[in-house]
Amino acid sequence: MLKGFKEFLARGNIVDLAVAVVIGTAFTALVTKFTDSIITPLINRIGVNAQSDVGILRIGIGGGQTIDLNVLLSAAINFFLIAFAVYFLVVLPYNTLRKKGEVEQPGDTQVVLLTEIRDLLAQTNGDSPGRHGGRGTPSPTDGPRASTESQ
């Protein structure tokens, strides 16, 4: 049981996921501190009345209490900064590398041979039109039969 768990943890996907979570958590903390220390104070100063310290995004509701929309706006900016960075620094490069790495796989030889057998059987049993190798069916492009029919 312990061996199976060790193999599960040693797989590449699990290790990659663990690294991504650690880096993502650290990056989130960095962006949150940036937003809290730089963006939020700038947003707090938008439309502030010098006498009451209540502005466009901080609405006084009486009794010295306010509805502070600055916190919500800061959280939204925080989210969009993280989403932007993750998309352009992780997702986009990963997708381009994955597309470059995709190589067209040659057809499975067993499938090619079975297709040729099916076509031969259809021809010997009578010309049936359609998928089963009738008169309108083109010659195979792969496999042993393709080289003999092209000669």
Swiss-Prot record:
Instruction: Write out the ranges of the annotated region (Disordered).
Output: 122-151
Which top-rank group of organisms is this from? Bacteria
Keyword Cell membrane appears in the UniProt entry: yes
Which residue ranges does UniProt annotate as crossing the membrane?
A: 15-43, 69-89
Could you list which ranges are Cytoplasmic topological domains? Answer: 1-14, 90-151
Per UniProt, the keywords (alphabetical) are: Cell membrane, Ion channel, Ion transport, Membrane, Transmembrane, Transmembrane helix, Transport
Which cellular compartments is it found in? Cell membrane
Q: Which residues lie on this side of the membrane: Extracellular?
A: 44-68
Main location group: membrane
Q: Which Gene3D superfamilies match?
A: 1.20.5.220, Large-conductance mechanosensitive channel, MscL, domain 1 (1.10.1200.120)
User: GO CC terms for this protein?
Assistant: membrane; plasma membrane
GO MF terms here are:
gated channel activity; identical protein binding; mechanosensitive monoatomic ion channel activity
Could you confirm whether the keyword Cell membrane appears in this record? yes
Q: How does it sit in the membrane?
A: Multi-pass membrane protein
A Gene Ontology BP annotation from the UniProt entry:
transmembrane transport
Q: What does this protein do?
A: Channel that opens in response to stretch forces in the membrane lipid bilayer. The force required to trigger channel opening depends on the nature of the membrane lipids; the presence of phosphatidylinositol enhances mechanosensitivity of the channel. May participate in the regulation of osmotic pressure changes within the cell.
Q: How does it assemble?
A: Homopentamer.
Q: What else is known?
A: E.coli inner membranes are often used to measure the activity of heterologously expressed channels, but the lipid composition of E.coli membranes differs considerably from that of M.tuberculosis. Phosphatidylinositol is one of the major constituents of M.tuberculosis membranes, but not of E.coli membranes, and this affects channel activity.
Q: Which family does it belong to?
A: Belongs to the MscL family.
The protein here is known as Large-conductance mechanosensitive channel
- To which species is this protein native? Mycobacterium tuberculosis (strain ATCC 25618 / H37Rv)
**Gene that specifies this protein:** mscL
